[in-house]
């Protein structure tokens, strides 16, 4: 894989993913000190020449969200001042994406827009992310945004499993487009869970649209946070006669007691990617399995540098 003129740096959010990406690119990981001063302020020093290079900073803004976001901002500034030719922020998991609008004109921030502004002011010239929580966030930027998808990775794994009588389930109405695309590619039926959310991180399953009895159900979503909604959905699917229930999700946020909740749930398996490193309790959970996004990210980095099409990676 040609990677001439390309350099990859990382903060402390997901160094293992960065190491896997540069291994696929057959280049070393960029040398940088990303630490803290005694008072907790972020300290960054680029420790090699980046002049005239196309630099990618691979940094998910996952928990600790504010620390990882600030590391990214300070790294961008350090690279800009070191005369990098172009800076791409590769943010596999884009934090602060869940507040992307003002529902019913509520007095809330649009934090996704705030982060977009911060990245641009810092000096980012392109953003690369994966499975954005809301596609419209791309419009918050005045620079190019490439939102790629983990679907080829998840699809490949699903096809290897070769489940019979498969049914793709959307966890809510908002996820129907994603779930329908997966169902179409697999050539299977689609069901939808109709739910309402009275407050953040709390959802009540209302109804299931579609026949699930005797089916192997795959719940497709962009992220798992507390896992409460997912576990409740699996329980209802099993009560309606589902044979097995699997979940395929891109981002394993898995906050609070999510791993324990999944372990005790009706879910047979939860498959996630490595956009976010697994916490210790999640890594030890026998029901959670992680797939690598490194080959996809490495190929995307190369295509960006060459000026090749990225959309063709996902055309099917």
From Swiss-Prot:
Stored Gene3D superfamilies: 3.40.50.2020
Family matches, as Pfam families: Pribosyl_synth, Pribosyltran_N
Chief place of localization: cytoplasm
UniProt: ATP binding residues: 39-41, 98-99
Entry EC number(s): 2.7.6.1
Subunit structure as annotated in this protein's UniProt entry: Homohexamer.
Protein name: Ribose-phosphate pyrophosphokinase
Provenance organism: Ralstonia nicotianae (strain ATCC BAA-1114 / GMI1000)
Gene it is expressed from: prs
């Amino acid at each position: 894989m040609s990677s001439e003129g390309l350099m990859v740096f990382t903060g402390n959010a997901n160094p293992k993913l960065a190491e896997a990406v540069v291994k696929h690119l057959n280049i070393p990981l960029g040398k940088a000190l990303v630490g803290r001063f005694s008072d907790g302020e972020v300290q960054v020093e680029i420790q090699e020449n980046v002049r005239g290079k196309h630099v990618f900073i691979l940094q998910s803004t996952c928990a600790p969200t504010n620390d990882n976001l600030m590391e990214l901002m300070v790294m961008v500034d350090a690279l800009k001042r070191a005369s990098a030719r172009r800076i791409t922020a590769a943010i596999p998991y884009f934090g602060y994406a869940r507040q992307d609008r003002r529902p019913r004109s509520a007095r809330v921030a649009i934090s996704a827009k705030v982060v977009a502004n911060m990245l641009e002011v810092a000096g980012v010239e392109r953003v690369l992310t994966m499975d954005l929580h809301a596609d419209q966030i791309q419009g918050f930027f005045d620079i190019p945004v490439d939102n790629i998808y983990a679907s080829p990775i998840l699809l490949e794994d699903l096809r290897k499993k070769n489940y019979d009588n498969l049914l793709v389930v959307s966890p809510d109405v908002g996820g129907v487009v994603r779930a329908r695309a997966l169902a179409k590619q697999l050539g299977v039926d689609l069901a939808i869970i109709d739910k309402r959310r009275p407050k953040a991180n709390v959802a009540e399953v209302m109804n299931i649209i579609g026949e699930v009895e005797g089916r192997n159900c795959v719940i497709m979503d962009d992220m798992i946070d507390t896992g409460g909604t997912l576990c409740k959905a699996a329980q209802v699917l099993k009560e309606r006669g589902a044979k097995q229930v699997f979940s395929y999700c891109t981002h394993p946020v898995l906050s609070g007691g999510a791993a324990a909740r999944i372990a005790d749930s009706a879910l047979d398996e939860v498959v996630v990617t490595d956009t976010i490193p697994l916490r210790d309790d999640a890594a030890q959970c026998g029901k959670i399995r992680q797939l690598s996004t490194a080959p996809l990210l490495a190929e995307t980095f190369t295509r960006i540098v060459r000026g090749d099409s990225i959309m063709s990676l996902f055309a099917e």
